[in-house]
From Swiss-Prot:
Its cofactor is Zn(2+). Belongs to the zinc-containing alcohol dehydrogenase family. It is an enzyme of class 1 (oxidoreductase). Zn(2+) 1 binds at residues 37, 59-60. Zn(2+) 2 binds at residues 89, 92, 95, 103. Transmembrane segments: none annotated. InterPro entries: ADH-like_N, ADH_Zn_CS, Glu_dehyd_C, GroES-like_sf, NAD(P)-bd_dom_sf, Zn_alcohol_dh. It catalyses: D-altritol + NAD(+) = keto-D-tagatose + NADH + H(+). This is D-altritol 5-dehydrogenase. Induction: Up-regulated by growth on D-altritol or galactitol. GO terms for molecular function: oxidoreductase activity; zinc ion binding.
Length: 336
C-alpha cells in the first residue's frame, strides 16, 4: 500500500509498505479521508509524542472496514467508520478518573502507532464509530471536533444549561473556526472570531461569525465584555491577551498548543477579584459520538473548512512547508 511515512525526525516520504497483519480485536480500515493537523508536523519534528519512528501519521480519519479479525462482531466488512485515535492505558490515575486524554502513557494512532495517511490502517475495533451515510470528508472532522467538545465541556459550556451570552475566539484557522461554530451551535448568540488575517476573517464572516482584528484598538476597547474567550492560536502573547477581555465571572480557555517553555503574565489578584475561570483543554476524551452528533446537524457548514482534498501523492508538501495561501484551511487526503 502507499503511505506517508515519517522515517526519522524531520524526514517524511511517500512509501510503498506492506499492509499490516490483523491481530485479534482489530479491523482493517480502507482509509477514505484523513485530515492534516499541526500535531502531525509536531510529530514529524519530535515535538509531540515519544518519537516513535518510523510511523505513519494521521489521527483524523474515516474509512470503510475492509476486514475484521475473527473475534470482532461489532463491525463487518463494508461498514463506514471513523477512528478515535487515542489509546489510553485505562489503569493510571487519570484514566481511573475518566480523564483518558491525560493518561500518563497516552498513545495514539498517527503518533505512536501507524495512522491514517495510508491506503489502509489497522485499528482496534473498539476505537471505531459507525458514521452511517455521512460523507467521509465530513466524518474525518470528528476528531478535531471532538477536541472542541472536550474543550467546551472543560469550560462548562452547555453544562447544566449554562450558555454564555457572547464569546470570542482567537485564531481563524480550522480548529478555531470549528470551536466558534460549535459555540454557536450550543446557543451562544454572538460569537466573534479574532485574527490578523483579513481574508480569514472574511471567510469567518461568511460562515456567520462576527469578526475583529486581533490586537486592534477596537478589540482592546471591548475590555471585560466577553463571557467566554478562547485562544486557538497557541501563541503565548495572544493567550495572555485573553484575560483583560474576559467579563467579570467569565472563562478563558487555553485551547491552542503553546510551546512548552512559553510563559505569560497574569495578575492573581485580577483572577481573584473578578472571579475568573482559567481552563485548559488537551485532546479529546472519548468525545467522538458527541462530535458526530454535531456533524449530523452542522456538518454542511463545517465541511466548508475542508479546502483541499488530495491524493496521497500530493500530500507530502503540506508536511514539509507551511502553506502561504491563507485560504488553505483543512487539508485532507481523499482516496482516489
Amino acid at each position: 500500500m502507499h503511505a506517508i511515512q515519517f522515517v526519522e525526525k524531520g524526514r517524511a516520504v511517500l512509501a510503498e509498505l506492506p499492509v499490516a497483519d490483523l491481530p485479534p480485536g482489530h479491523a482493517l480500515v480502507r482509509v477514505k479521508a484523513s485530515g492534516l493537523c499541526h500535531t502531525d508536523i509536531d510529530v514529524l519534528h519530535a515535538r509531540y509524542g515519544d518519537g516513535a519512528f518510523p510511523v505513519i501519521p494521521g489521527h483524523e480519519y474515516a474509512g470503510e472496514v475492509a476486514a475484521v479479525a475473527s473475534d470482532v462482531t461489532v463491525f463487518k466488512a463494508g461498514d463506514r467508520v471513523v477512528v478515535d485515535p487515542n489509546l489510553p492505558c485505562g489503569t493510571c490515575a487519570s484514566c481511573r478518573k475518566g480523564l483518558t486524554n491525560l493518561c500518563s502513557t497516552l498513545k495514539a494512532y498517527g503518533v505512536s502507532h501507524n495512522g491514517g495517511f495510508a491506503e489502509f490502517s489497522v485499528v482496534r475495533a473498539d476505537h471505531l464509530h459507525g458514521i452511517g451515510s455521512m460523507p467521509y470528508h465530513v466524518a474525518a472532522l470528528a476528531e478535531p471536533l471532538a477536541c472542541v467538545v472536550n474543550g467546551m465541556q472543560s469550560a462548562g459550556i452547555g453544562e447544566s444549561g449554562v450558555v454564555p451570552e457572547n464569546a470570542l475566539v482567537f485564531g481563524a484557522g480550522p480548529i478555531g473556526l470549528l470551536l466558534a461554530l460549535s459555540l454557536k451551535s450550543r446557543g451562544i448568540a454572538t460569537v466573534t472570531m479574532a485574527d490578523i488575517n483579513e481574508s480569514r476573517l472574511a471567510f469567518a464572516q461568511d460562515l456567520g461569525l462576527q469578526t475583529a482584528v486581533s490586537g486592534s484598538e477596537a478589540l482592546s476597547r471591548q475590555r471585560k465584555e466577553f463571557d467566554f474567550v478562547a485562544d486557538a492560536t497557541g501563541i503565548a502573547p495572544v493567550a495572555e491577551a485573553m484575560i483583560p477581555l474576559v467579563a467579570d465571572g467569565g472563562t478563558a480557555l487555553f485551547f491552542g498548543v503553546c510551546a512548552p517553555d512559553a510563559r505569560i503574565s497574569v495578575a492573581p489578584f485580577e483572577i481573584f477579584r473578578r472571579q475568573l475561570k482559567l481552563v485548559g483543554s488537551h485532546s479529546l476524551n472519548r468525545n467522538i459520538p458527541q462530535a458526530l452528533a454535531i456533524l449530523e446537524t452542522d456538518g454542511e457548514v463545517m465541511a466548508r473548512l475542508v479546502s483541499h482534498r488530495l491524493p496521497l501523492s500530493e500530500m507530502l508538501p503540506f508536511f514539509t512547508k507551511k502553506p502561504s495561501d491563507p485560504a488553505t484551511m483543512k487539508v485532507q487526503f481523499a482516496a482516489e
